Amino acid sequence: MDKKERQEIERQRRETALKNTFFNRFLLLRYSIALFFFGNIYWVLIQFIRPSLVMIFPIILVVFSILATVEQFRLYGKRSVRLGITQMFVCLQAIISTGLLVLTWTSWFTYLFPIFENNQLARVFVFIVLLLGLVISLLDIRRIQDIYQQKDKAFQRYIQLEKSSLNL
C-alpha cells in the first residue's frame, strides 16, 4: 500500500466515524422506540384474550413505532434531522399512557388489561409500568427538542470529532 491509498483509507475511516457519531445522537430514541414496540406488541397480544375496540390503540402505537424506526434508519449518513414521525409517535405514546394511567383506576381496567386480576396489587403494578413509560416518553420528547436545538451532548461530541478530523 502506498501513501495515497493509506490516506484514502484514513479519510474513509474518519468519514465513517463522523457518520456514526452523528447517527448516535438518536441512539436512546431507538432504544426507547424498541422498548415501546415490544410493550405495545405485548399489549396487542393480551387483547386477543378478550377482543374489543381497545385493540386499536396498541395497533396504532405498533404501526407508529415501526414508522419511527424506519425514519431513524433513514437518517443514517444524512446531516438533516427530521424526526417528525418519531416525535409524533412519542407524543402519541405519552398521551395514551396518560389516559391509561387514569383508566387504571376505573372499571375499564379489566378491558384494557384482561390478563390481570381486578385487585389493588395488579392496578398498582400496571400503574407503575405505565408511569415509567410516560417518563421515558417525556424524556424522549425533551431529547428530540435538544436534538433540534443542537443542545444534545452527542452533537457536541460530533462537532469535536469533526474539528479534530479537519485538523488532520
Summary of predicted features, one role per range:
Residues 90-117, 134:
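C-terminal halves and exits of single transmembrane alpha-helices
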Residues 1-54:
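N-terminal signal-anchor transmembrane alpha-helix
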Residues 41-49, 73-77, 104-113:
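Juxtamembrane "helix-exit" motif on the non-cytosolic side of transmembrane helices
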Residues 70-85:
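Membrane-helix interface/capping segments
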